[in-house]
């Protein structure tokens, strides 16, 4: 079975997820034109190679009108790391999460006064209109919208407002839309049969947002991570952003330790901040010996039926179940 595994020992962010997925391809630069053909208005995907604590990997940058937005947290912790372009892009910087550190809490980390002309916010209906016109298959579009539905629901709970009244800030920007669309496209293109992830390292301390300084995880991120194993640790800062949390929540089927698998490719997505440990998101693509099996459990209350009639009903049920998943239990 083809397995995709996310190692979230340094959290997860939208651009890091995209970069790590691109790293799984033998020639990531050849995939870049496909991302730029998605058709997000005024958006250009660019790719940089670099190192973090000696680990080589990729960094995804999204340019809006030829410019890249940076958030307050990134600006505060930024450090040059000798990146070299893999396409028509300038050399850049590395350090930690997300060029835009796209924190869902619709305030996300933008520095007051740092809002460029392309720093626009959208509500859910605006985003749906943008996604509708993208050059993606219907199934990929459905996943993009599902990720945003999760973000909207988390924001709604955090701010005690109906989803219809939620106006996204950072995660409503075009660069965040680009991260989500690219991640969904690449996961579909890689076509794993199962997706797993480690427990997510969320960081600790506080994070700068448009609404002020909030504890990690920020409220919306916390809601997105409900039901998912997480841990804090001693690293100060937000390691798991809302966009990263929403993407993983939507796609990951099981959170736990790395299972026995034969790896075919390993990818590293570099973050923007510098920490004492390698700030990377690692993905592993390979094969595991586990068999895919579905179990259909039908429960019914029989008042007056002969054994022959019950057997006939079971036979009819099996006809509509494909051979690889023909495991039926009736109680």
Which stretches of residues belong to each language-model region?
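Mobile "lid/hinge" segments at catalytic clefts and subdomain interfaces of large enzymes
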Residues: 192-294
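Divalent metal-coordination and catalytic microenvironments
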Residues: 11, 60, 175, 248, ...
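Conserved phosphate/anionic-ligand binding catalytic regions in large, soluble enzymes, centered on
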Residues: 6-18, 168-187
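Single conserved hydrophobic/aromatic residue that forms the stacking wall/gate
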Residues: 319-331
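Glycine-rich nucleotide/cofactor/substrate-binding loop typically near the N-terminus or early
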Residues: 23-24, 28-158, 218, 227-230, ...
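Short glycine-/aliphatic-rich beta-strand segments at the starts of folded cytosolic domains
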Residues: 292-304
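Extreme N-terminal starter segment of soluble prokaryotic enzymes
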Residues: 1-4
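Short amphipathic alpha-helix segments
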Residues: 306-318, 322
């Amino acid at each position: 079975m083809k397995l995709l595994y996310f190692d979230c020992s340094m959290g997860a962010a939208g651009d890091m997820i995209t970069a790590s997925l691109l790293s799984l391809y033998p020639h990531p630069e050849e995939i870049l034109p496909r991302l730029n053909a998605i058709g997000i208005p005024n958006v250009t995907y660019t790719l940089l190679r670099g190192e973090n604590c000696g680990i080589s990997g990729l960094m995804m940058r999204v340019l809006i009108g030829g410019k890249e937005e940076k958030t307050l947290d990134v600006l505060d912790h930024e450090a040059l790391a000798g990146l070299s372009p893999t396409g028509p892009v300038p050399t850049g910087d590395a350090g930690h999460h997300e060029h835009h550190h796209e924190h869902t809490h619709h305030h996300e980390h933008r520095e007051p006064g740092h809002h460029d002309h392309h720093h626009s916010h959208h509500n859910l209906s605006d985003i749906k209109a943008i996604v509708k016109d993208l050059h993606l298959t219907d199934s990929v579009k459905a996943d993009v919208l599902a990720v945003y539905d999760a973000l909207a629901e988390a924001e709604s709970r955090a701010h005690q407002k109906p989803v219809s009244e939620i106006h996204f800030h950072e995660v409503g920007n075009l660069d965040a839309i680009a991260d989500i669309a690219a991640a969904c496209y690449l996961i579909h293109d890689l076509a794993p049969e199962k997706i797993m992830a480690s427990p997510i390292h969320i960081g600790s301390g506080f994070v700068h947002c448009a609404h002020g300084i909030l504890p990690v995880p920020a409220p919306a991120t916390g809601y997105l991570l409900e039901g998912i194993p997480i841990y804090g640790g001693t690293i100060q800062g937000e390691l798991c952003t809302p966009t990263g949390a929403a993407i993983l929540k939507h796609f990951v089927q099981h959170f736990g330790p790395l299972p026995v698998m034969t790896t075919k490719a390993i990818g590293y997505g570099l973050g923007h901040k510098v920490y004492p440990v390698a700030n990377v998101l690692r993905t592993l693509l390979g094969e595991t010996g586990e068999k895919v099996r579905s179990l259909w459990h039908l429960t019914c209350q029989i008042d007056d039926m002969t054994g022959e009639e019950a057997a006939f009903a079971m036979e009819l049920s099996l006809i509509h179940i494909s051979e690889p998943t023909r495991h039926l239990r009736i109680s």
